[in-house]
C-alpha cells in the first residue's frame, strides 16, 4: 500500500473518527492506568503516552519486519491477549483473557513490512514492549527502486516512511549499529 492508498484509508477512517475516538475513550478513558516510568533511552519501537491526553494508556507506532512482527504477535499471546493473524490487516480491540486490560491494534502491510499502532493500558505488556527491540525492513527493502544518493527533500511515501518509522528507528541506534548500514543509506539517514 502506497501513500495514496494510506491517505485514502486514512480519510475513510476519518469518517468514523468521532465514533473511534468515542470507542477509545470508552476503552481507555475510565480507570487511571498505573503510572509507567518510561526510560530515558528506549530501543525501537518507542512506547509513548497516547497523543490523546484524556486517554489513560500508552502507545506504540512502528513499522516491523516480518520476523519482528511474528515476535510481537507471540508477545501479545503470551501476555494473555487474543491471537490475530500476523499477516492480515486488523483494526480492532484485543481483550485480555483474565484481566480487565485491553489492546487497540491497527496493523496493515506496507513498506515491505507491517505498520502497527498499538494502544494499551496493560502495564505488564507495556513493560515488555519497552524492552522489545525490533527493526523495520531495511530502506532498500521498503524502497527497492530508490537511490538515496539522488534524494533531496522528501515527499509522499518516502517522507511519511522517514518521519513516522525510519527516523525514530535510526535515532534509537548507537553509532556502531548505524555504521553497519551501506554508506549511501547511512548518509541519507544522517541527513534526513
Predicted segments with their positions:
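Polar/charged low-complexity regulatory segments
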Residues: 2-192
